[in-house]
Amino acid sequence: MADLANSNLGAVTFNYDIKIDLDTSFTGKDLLRTRLRGGNFDQSAFGFAASTGIPSPFGGTYATASGLEVAFEEGDGLNIDRLFYQFPIGSDFTVTAGGRVRQDDMLAVWPSAYPSDTVLDYFTYAGAPGAYSLNLGSGAGLWWSNDGFSISANYVSTNGSDGNPNTGGIATDGASGTGTVQLAYADSSWGIAAAYTYSSMNWGTVYESTATPLATAVGLLGNSNNVGLSAWWQPENSGFIPSISAGWGLSSTSGA
């Protein structure tokens, strides 16, 4: 088995990923963001969709933990990766909406000492890949934040640009939608957050590098309910003491 995995994962590769953010503000407090992105990665630095090549009894092959969050898999093409508008309402509320917006763009708090765009995909989801799915598409969200406490709610449709309600749209059977609510507290050095995400059946699988083929495909069985608890701490001054991030997640599906 080890020889089979190594035969699929042994090549040296050269890849690139480039992001260009075009940010505009009309009032000094709002943000219109357009992100252009290009790259030539596969899902893993080793290609083969991060697969070991070892068959799974549940179908497919076992994945590695080498899936790359920084990998943009568009074969040298330049694409619009983000397009959304964000503006405040009063001093405590913020609204975000756009045709190309991601779940974490609409959360008041990202529950980790590390960003949502880390190098390895495995460490991207704050310990709860079902709750923090980072769904990308058409969406809108609202958050309230005051004295470190925050409440966020958002909705994202992967197929929001498709006018056929059977295969796309907003809040339709074909939307591939996720709805998320997050409660959080954060200050300059630590924080804690709880999140709930409802994912429709058509949203599909959790990213393969986060678990086994069976676990990642559970979302195909039906609508899923996902919860996540995450916390982090970092020293106020940089040095030898490391930052600590921890997360726990649980998912259930109507089809299991």
Task: Briefly describe each language-model feature range.
Residues E74, A131, T172-D173, L220:
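Charged, low-complexity surface patches
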Residues F46-A65, D162-T172, W203-L220, S252-A256:
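Solvent-exposed loop segments that connect transmembrane elements
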Residues M1-N8:
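Long, leucine- and charge-enriched amphipathic alpha-helices
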Residues L9-S161, L183-S188:
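Outer membrane beta-barrel
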Residues G148, G174, A186-A256:
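Detector for outer-membrane/organellar transmembrane beta-barrel domains
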